[in-house]
Every structure is written in structure tokens, then in C-alpha cells.
């Protein structure tokens, strides 16, 4: 029921009294708020300090991430402040936790500059995470309205065009990270690239921390690397690539490296998440103008995404990076050495690949999201995976993914080329089995053993790594579980 005119007038008068007024009474809490299609929505997991009411805590988060300060200021009257105040509109207890709550907050679209991740994040995560009223705070999910998404370019290339450029369909793409990360000379680096690609991989890649160090300057790496790409592509008759990391200390240096990457004929370049949101958007714009696939390594994300109660969930990073315009982003393996609950990872992949997602609490998706025709972003699975897990990887991750076997290629006893061949044969035999309608998940180990009878490198890899899997409990799991319901 709507408030009476007298009631609204009384509330408004109280709201502008001098001094400190609870955020909820200042207009940052509205349980009757009607969500607009143009609102930016955010859902926070909050742990209020002892004695702080959850509703007041949610209102404080809304206030401090929009227009509020600690006391009433008369200059509010010079603005459309009732419109611009963020509205906390719902607070739910977190299942299984006694001191945590989900706070839902709506933001007026005009609070954000068009096409600027830096501005969006300055509000949503800029100040509230240090707020004393909360013991811990985590941004779990966001709903970005179509009107706002249309101000971002989205992935520079997208999954469909990438496959067209590579002429590779119906299977995951295969890659590997050059190992060791640091210390190789340019010539030896190029040899690793050549061996891996000639053995059957689609891509080799730089790791996150190889830039331009004294043991190998960037131009040396690029020149030897592209030689390896070209020789392997000519030998295999396939389009091949190497992710040249153009990350540097300044945008000027990054543009210089990216331009050189284009000049030598590379189809793809790479940046790290740590360069920052504005730099990522700038490189994505450059990549689109120059028809370059842009790979993003999520270096640094676990410093704020891994813990359950404070920071932000990686699904939010997935959304922001799709908006920013990267074509690839590392998004988890489930079975590898890095953090990744199966349901959470599925939610990440759906966020990157679907044109529209519905609410799916078991995957951690708290809002429905229409992606406004932005291109799809290719997830990358890397970190502790090997060919013996191929049936699991395809089952969990599907076709639209780059499977990066670093140690699982370069650690092969018979050499890099043999490691690449083992991975390619494992992938091909599993895709064939799936396409034939076989239960490849259950039969996976036997399918691999059968293929290994005519592929020595695969047999050696299976003998070496067997069924190694990093079975550690995930620190970030779903708060909701699926329950069986009777059909009526």
C-alpha cells in the first residue's frame, strides 16, 4: 500500500534534520521498492558487526555505495536525492549461517557513467568494504540492465568468429602454457612453442608473469615465438596461435607490444587482470579495431574472490570482463589444482557463454541476466589438468572452452611434442565417443586406454599421471542445494 502524502512529508522532513540519522530512515531502505528494468542490481553477503541490525546494515551499504556520508548534508536538497539514493529492498538470512545475510540493493542507472567499468566499480566496491558497520562483506552477484550493457562493446571477437578464424569446430580448443614460467631464452622459448603446436595443440601461451625481464626481452620472445607458430602451422596445415602477453607498466608500452604482435602476424594477444579495469577496456577496444583475439589471465583474482565472506565472487568478475570486451578468461577446471566447485564453475561458464541466464541458486546465479547481444566470452580451463581427465573435462565444461595443459604437456617424459600429441589424441577419441552416443563419462578411462594402444605418447601419459586429481574441498560453494520435487 502506498504511503499517504502526510506520511511522505513527515518522513522527508525527518530525513533532512541535521545530525546523524540511521541510514534506513534516510531513505536507503525501502521494502516496498518496485524494481525497474533499468536498475543496476547488486546482491551482497554481509556479516554485520554485533548489535547492528541487518536492515540498517543493508541500508548503510546502499548509502555508502551511492550518495550518503555519515551525517545529513544540506546539499542533498540541491540534487534529485530521493531518486539517486540506492535502495536496499530485501534482506534474507544466509542458509546455514547465524550471522550472515544476503542484502539486495537497487541503483538508479544515472548513477553510473556509460561504458565505464572504473566508474561502476568505484561505487559498488569502492568504499563499502572498509565500512565499520560490517564485519565482512562480499559482492555475490549483479544484474546489469540492457540499457547499461549497450554502452559496452563486449568481447572483441567472440566465440563464433574465433572458431571461424581458426576453422575449428565441434570440440574444445587445446592449449598449453610455456613452462618454466620464467628463465628461458628466446630461442628455447620459441622451441617450446613449436614443439607444442606441432604435436597437435591449437595454442601455446605466455604465463601471467612473463613480460620483459633481463633473461628475455619481450621482442625477442615475440620473434622466436611467432617463428615457432608459423613453422608448426605450415607443418600441420592448421591455423595455430600463441598468446603473446603484452602486459607492461604503462599503456604506451602495452600498445607498442600489441602493435608489434599484430605486425608479426599473430592472431591473438594476452593481458593480465592486474592491469586494471580501464586498461583492460582500452586493450579490448584496440583488439576489436585490429581484429585481434584478446586473452585475459585472471592473475590476482583469488586475493578477493576465494574467501566465502569477504571480497567478491568470481562470477562478478566474469560479468565485468564480458562487458569490458575480453575474448578469453580463465574460469576454472573443477578437476585441476586451482579453486573450483563444480556448480560454481558451471555458473561462471554460463555467465560467459549464454545469451541469457535465469536465476539458478545452486550455481550461485541470484539474478536473471539478458546479455543484450554482447558476444560470448570463451572460458579457459587451466591448472593441474592432464589427458587422463579428458572425459571429466568435456562432461563438466563442454565444447566452448580452451583446455590448457601446461605441465600436462611439457611434463611428458618423451618431450613436449609427445605431450601435445597425447592431449590431442585423448581429446579426439573422447569427442568421437561422445558423438557416437556412448556413455563417455563412465567409459572414459577405457576409451583412453583403447586409444593409447595405437598412440605411444598417450599410453606414457596415462601411465605417468594415472588418475591424479586435486581433491581438496572448495572454499567457495553454493549456499543452496537442489532438492527433489514430486511431479504432479
Swiss-Prot record:
<feature type="binding site">
    <location>
        <position position="330"/>
    </location>
    <ligand>
        <name>substrate</name>
    </ligand>
</feature>
<comment type="function">
    <text>RuBisCO catalyzes two reactions: the carboxylation of D-ribulose 1,5-bisphosphate, the primary event in carbon dioxide fixation, as well as the oxidative fragmentation of the pentose substrate in the photorespiration process. Both reactions occur simultaneously and in competition at the same active site.</text>
</comment>
<feature type="active site" description="Proton acceptor">
    <location>
        <position position="179"/>
    </location>
</feature>
<feature type="binding site">
    <location>
        <position position="207"/>
    </location>
    <ligand>
        <name>Mg(2+)</name>
    </ligand>
</feature>
<keyword id="KW-0601">Photorespiration</keyword>
<feature type="binding site">
    <location>
        <position position="177"/>
    </location>
    <ligand>
        <name>substrate</name>
    </ligand>
</feature>
<keyword id="KW-0113">Calvin cycle</keyword>
<dbReference type="InterPro" id="IPR000685">
    <property type="entry name" value="RuBisCO_lsu_C"/>
</dbReference>
<dbReference type="Pfam" id="PF00016">
    <property type="entry name" value="RuBisCO_large"/>
</dbReference>
<feature type="active site" description="Proton acceptor">
    <location>
        <position position="297"/>
    </location>
</feature>
<keyword id="KW-0560">Oxidoreductase</keyword>
<comment type="subunit">
    <text>Heterohexadecamer of 8 large chains and 8 small chains.</text>
</comment>
<feature type="site" description="Transition state stabilizer">
    <location>
        <position position="337"/>
    </location>
</feature>
<keyword id="KW-0503">Monooxygenase</keyword>
<dbReference type="InterPro" id="IPR017443">
    <property type="entry name" value="RuBisCO_lsu_fd_N"/>
</dbReference>
<dbReference type="GO" id="GO:0019253">
    <property type="term" value="P:reductive pentose-phosphate cycle"/>
</dbReference>
<dbReference type="GO" id="GO:0009507">
    <property type="term" value="C:chloroplast"/>
</dbReference>
<feature type="binding site">
    <location>
        <position position="208"/>
    </location>
    <ligand>
        <name>Mg(2+)</name>
    </ligand>
</feature>
<feature type="binding site">
    <location>
        <position position="382"/>
    </location>
    <ligand>
        <name>substrate</name>
    </ligand>
</feature>
<comment type="similarity">
    <text>Belongs to the RuBisCO large chain family. Type I subfamily.</text>
</comment>
<dbReference type="GO" id="GO:0016984">
    <property type="term" value="F:ribulose-bisphosphate carboxylase activity"/>
</dbReference>
<dbReference type="InterPro" id="IPR020878">
    <property type="entry name" value="RuBisCo_large_chain_AS"/>
</dbReference>
<feature type="binding site">
    <location>
        <position position="181"/>
    </location>
    <ligand>
        <name>substrate</name>
    </ligand>
</feature>
<feature type="modified residue" description="N6-carboxylysine">
    <location>
        <position position="205"/>
    </location>
</feature>
<keyword id="KW-0460">Magnesium</keyword>
<keyword id="KW-0150">Chloroplast</keyword>
<keyword id="KW-0120">Carbon dioxide fixation</keyword>
<keyword id="KW-0479">Metal-binding</keyword>
<keyword id="KW-0602">Photosynthesis</keyword>
<dbReference type="InterPro" id="IPR033966">
    <property type="entry name" value="RuBisCO"/>
</dbReference>
<dbReference type="GO" id="GO:0000287">
    <property type="term" value="F:magnesium ion binding"/>
</dbReference>
<dbReference type="Pfam" id="PF02788">
    <property type="entry name" value="RuBisCO_large_N"/>
</dbReference>
<feature type="binding site" description="in homodimeric partner">
    <location>
        <position position="127"/>
    </location>
    <ligand>
        <name>substrate</name>
    </ligand>
</feature>
<dbReference type="InterPro" id="IPR036376">
    <property type="entry name" value="RuBisCO_lsu_C_sf"/>
</dbReference>
<keyword id="KW-0934">Plastid</keyword>
<feature type="binding site" description="via carbamate group">
    <location>
        <position position="205"/>
    </location>
    <ligand>
        <name>Mg(2+)</name>
    </ligand>
</feature>
<protein>
    <recommendedName>
        <fullName>Ribulose bisphosphate carboxylase large chain</fullName>
        <ecNumber>4.1.1.39</ecNumber>
    </recommendedName>
</protein>
<dbReference type="InterPro" id="IPR036422">
    <property type="entry name" value="RuBisCO_lsu_N_sf"/>
</dbReference>
<keyword id="KW-0456">Lyase</keyword>
<dbReference type="InterPro" id="IPR020888">
    <property type="entry name" value="RuBisCO_lsuI"/>
</dbReference>
<feature type="binding site">
    <location>
        <position position="298"/>
    </location>
    <ligand>
        <name>substrate</name>
    </ligand>
</feature>
<dbReference type="GO" id="GO:0004497">
    <property type="term" value="F:monooxygenase activity"/>
</dbReference>
Amino acid at each position: 500500500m502506498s504511503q499517504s502524502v502526510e506520511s511522505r512529508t513527515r518522513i522527508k522532513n525527518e530525513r533532512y534534520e541535521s545530525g546523524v540519522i540511521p541510514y534506513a530512515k534516510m531513505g536507503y531502505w525501502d521494502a516496498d521498492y518496485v524494481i525497474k528494468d533499468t536498475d543496476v542490481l547488486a546482491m551482497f553477503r554481509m556479516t554485520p558487526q554485533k548489535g547492528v541490525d541487518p536492515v540498517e546494515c543493508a541500508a548503510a551499504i546502499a548509502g555508502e555505495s551511492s550518495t550518503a556520508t555519515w551525517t545529513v548534508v544540506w546539499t542533498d536538497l540541491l540534487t534529485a536525492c530521493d531518486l539517486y539514493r540506492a535502495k536496499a529492498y530485501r534482506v534474507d538470512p544466509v542458509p546455514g549461517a547465524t550471522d550472515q545475510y544476503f542484502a539486495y540493493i537497487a541503483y538508479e542507472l544515472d548513477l553510473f557513467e556509460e561504458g565505464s567499468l572504473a566508474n561502476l566499480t568505484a561505487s559498488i566496491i569502492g568504499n563499502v568494504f572498509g565500512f565499520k558497520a560490517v564485519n565482512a562483506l562480499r559482492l555475490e552477484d549483479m544484474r546489469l540492465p540492457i540499457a547499461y550493457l549497450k554502452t559496452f562493446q563486449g568481447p572483441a571477437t567472440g566465440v563464433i568468429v574465433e572458431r571461424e578464424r581458426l576453422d575449428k569446430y565441434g570440440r574444445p580448443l587445446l592449449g598449453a602454457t610455456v613452462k618454466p614460467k620464467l628463465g628461458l631464452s628466446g630461442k628455447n622459448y620459441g622451441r617450446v612453442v613449436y614443439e607444442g603446436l606441432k604435436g597437435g595443440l591449437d595454442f601455446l601461451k605466455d604465463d601471467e608473469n612473463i613480460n620483459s625481464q633481463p633473461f628475455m626481452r619481450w621482442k625477442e620472445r615475440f620473434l622466436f615465438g611467432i617463428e615457432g607458430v608459423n613453422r608448426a602451422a605450415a607443418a600441420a596445415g592448421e591455423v595455430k596461435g600463441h598468446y603473446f602477453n603484452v602486459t607492461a607498466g604503462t599503456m604506451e608500452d602495452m600498445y607498442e607490444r600489441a602493435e608489434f604482435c599484430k605486425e608479426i602476424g599473430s592472431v591473438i594477444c594476452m593481458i593480465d587482470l592486474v592491469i586494471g579495469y580501464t586498461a583492460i577496456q582500452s586493450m579490448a577496444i584496440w583488439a576489436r579495431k585490429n581484429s585481434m583475439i584478446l586473452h585475459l589471465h585472471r592473475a590476482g583474482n583469488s586475493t578477493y574472490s576465494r574467501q566465502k565472506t569477504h571480497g567478491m565472487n568470481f562470477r562478478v568478475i566474469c560479468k565485468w570482463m564480458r562487458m569490458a570486451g575480453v575474448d578469453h578468461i580463465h574460469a576454472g577446471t573443477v578437476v585441476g589444482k586451482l579453486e573450483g566447485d563444480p556448480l560454481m564453475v558451471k555458473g561462471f561458464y554460463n555467465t560467459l557463454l549464454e545469451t541469457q541466464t535465469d536465476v539458478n541458486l545452486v550455481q550461485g546465479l541470484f539474478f536473471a541476466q539478458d546479455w543484450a547481444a554482447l558476444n560470448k566470452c570463451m572460458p579457459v580451463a587451466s591448472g593441474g589438468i592432464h589427458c587422463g581427465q579428458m572425459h571429466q573435462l568435456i562432461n563438466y565444461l563442454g565444447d566452448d572452452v580452451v583446455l590448457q595443459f601446461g605441465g600436462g604437456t611439457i611434463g611428458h617424459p618423451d618431450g613436449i611434442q609427445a605431450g601435445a600429441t597425447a592431449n590431442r589424441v585423448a581429446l579426439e577419441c573422447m569427442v568421437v565417443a561422445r558423438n557416437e552416443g556412448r556413455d563417455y563419462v563412465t567409459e572414459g578411462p577405457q576409451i583412453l586406454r583403447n586409444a593409447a594402444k595405437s598412440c605411444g605418447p598417450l599410453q606414457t601419459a596415462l601411465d605417468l599421471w594415472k588418475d591424479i586429481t586435486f581433491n581438496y574441498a572448495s572454499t567457495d560453494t553454493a549456499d543452496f542445494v537442489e532438492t527433489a520435487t514430486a511431479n504432479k
